[in-house]
């Protein structure tokens, strides 16, 4: 009985240490504690595509923070785009990473006149008017996106944070830019039946990889907010909770009542 109890205690302590967010020398997040327009304030059915300069312009006009997605082109340029292929947004079944920036500029977003913007163009447009929530895209151990993004942000004077599903990308910022606020994106990969091994998906769902990145906040799927690791990080260790993707005003209001922040789309939370 004594040995079993000790083993249980060790297991609980190990789990807590793996899941634990950053708890010391936390950076100031006060300028980031707002709600964010998911991929800008867009309407894909009304001529304002997601992750377009126009969607970001509308978010700035509304005073909303902006959540956006970053990837690298074949020639190493940082662009703003969510999917790994152009099929859904541009009608071409080709990987973004296989194209140069000049080649990407030959495509329009959803039959509009808008192009896939560079991160540099977005920074110039936003110019510190609203905070940025920057998702770093990438499913492998290649972290070359991180220094490229950091170089563009080096002279940017607006408020921003980075987030990713990939803890290895957050680890780069932990090791090289600990002053930058970083957040772990999480969903239930087991229930969503995403690709990858069971062990990988279990570890990411339970955020056992937080030991690599020690995030400052958790950006959690609206559908899976009751996960034990999410509650441990936010309610016990005090990490801030960002909730995505909030598509109903009633969920937005509940998050607000709970003191949580929303990454929203499809409605105006001020109306």
Task: Walk through the language-model features, giving the residues of each.
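Phosphate-group recognition and catalysis centered on beta-loop-alpha active-site segments
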Residues: 1-271
């Amino acid at each position: 009985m004594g040995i079993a109890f000790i083993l249980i205690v060790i297991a609980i302590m190990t789990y807590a240490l793996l899941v634990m967010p950053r708890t010391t020398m936390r950076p100031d997040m006060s300028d980031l504690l707002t709600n964010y327009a998911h991929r800008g304030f867009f309407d894909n059915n009304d001529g304002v595509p997601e992750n377009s300069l126009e969607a970001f312009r509308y978010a700035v006009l509304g005073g909303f923070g902006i959540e956006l997605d970053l990837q690298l082109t074949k020639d190493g340029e940082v662009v703003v785009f969510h999917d790994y292929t152009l099929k859904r947004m541009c009608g071409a079944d080709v990987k973004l990473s296989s194209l140069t920036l000049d080649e990407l500029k030959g495509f329009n977003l959803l039959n509009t006149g808008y192009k896939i913007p560079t991160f540099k163009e977005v920074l110039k447009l936003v110019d510190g008017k609203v905070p940025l929530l920057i998702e770093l895209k990438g499913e492998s151990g290649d972290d070359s996106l991180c220094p490229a993004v950091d170089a563009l942000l080096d002279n940017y004077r607006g408020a921003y944070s980075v987030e990713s599903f990939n803890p290895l990308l957050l680890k780069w910022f932990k090791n090289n830019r600990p002053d930058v606020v970083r957040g772990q994106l999480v969903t239930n990969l087991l229930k969503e039946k995403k690709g990858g091994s069971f062990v990988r998906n279990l570890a990411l769902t339970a955020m056992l990889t937080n030991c690599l990145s020690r995030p400052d906040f958790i950006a959690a799927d609206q559908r899976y907010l009751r996960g034990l690791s999410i509650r441990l990080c936010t309610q016990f260790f005090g990490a801030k909770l960002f909730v995505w993707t909030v598509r109903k005003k009633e969920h937005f209001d509940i998050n607000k009542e709970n003191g949580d922040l929303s990454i929203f789309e499809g409605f105006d939370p001020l109306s």
